[in-house]
Amino acid sequence: MTSAANKRSIMTLFLDKVDIYCHQVRIVLAEKGVAYATEIVDSESISEDLMELNPYGTIPTLVDRDLVLFNSRIIMEYLDERFPHPPLMPVYPVSRGKSRLLMLRIEQDWYPVLEKAEKGSESERAIALKQLKEEILAIAPVFSQSLYFMSEEFRLVDCYIAPLLWRMQQLGVVFTGTGSKAIKSYMERVFQRDSFLQSVGEMTPKNLMEDK
């Protein structure tokens, strides 16, 4: 593992451009203003380099000098500690615990449904997107209470929910009805952040507020 890591003089992220977990990490790297190299991974043919670094061959995998990390949450928390400004986790332990629980719930409750929408049949996609839309509309008041997701500052929790909402938009979901304005305002605010724009590359988010 060390020999493969030592070949790299700059922080390197092994990623798949469409993977949601890689997207999370790219947002954090952009928020922190970290210079890094990328290596695109072909899921059909994992490179020997990646297998040497990460025995699971999973992405994202981050190499920082002699350190190799995998699992997006581990990577993001490492980056937040390694580059403390701007902070992406709350200061107090209770708030940190609540944030970690929120991230876990988004990952366990919503990400699998999104995966069904992205990889399933047409009917499975419709059912999955309807479920996601209804569940997010059900918590719409949360989006109106603060600038970001349950916080006045952009946090790691936003790095979980923003890629989900982005993918829903790309799949044609439009929030309408009660609570939709707050959700769309949140999406507009997050999608226009420099870090998010960097994380999606050349894709430009459309103006969500056109669809009131």
UniProtKB/Swiss-Prot annotation:
Pfam families: GST_C, GST_N_2. InterPro entries: Glutathione-S-Trfase_C-like, Glutathione-S-Trfase_C_sf, Glutathione_S-Trfase, Glutathione_S-Trfase_N, GST_C, GST_Omega/HSP26, SspA_C, SspA_N. Residues 9-87 form the GST N-terminal domain. GO terms for cellular component: cytoplasm. Gene3D superfamilies: 1.20.1050.10, Glutaredoxin. Residues 92-212 form the GST C-terminal domain. It comes from the Bacteria. Belongs to the GST superfamily. HSP26 family. Forms an equimolar complex with the RNA polymerase holoenzyme (RNAP) but not with the core enzyme. NCBIfam families: PRK09481.1. This is Stringent starvation protein A homolog. It comes from Histophilus somni. The gene is sspA.
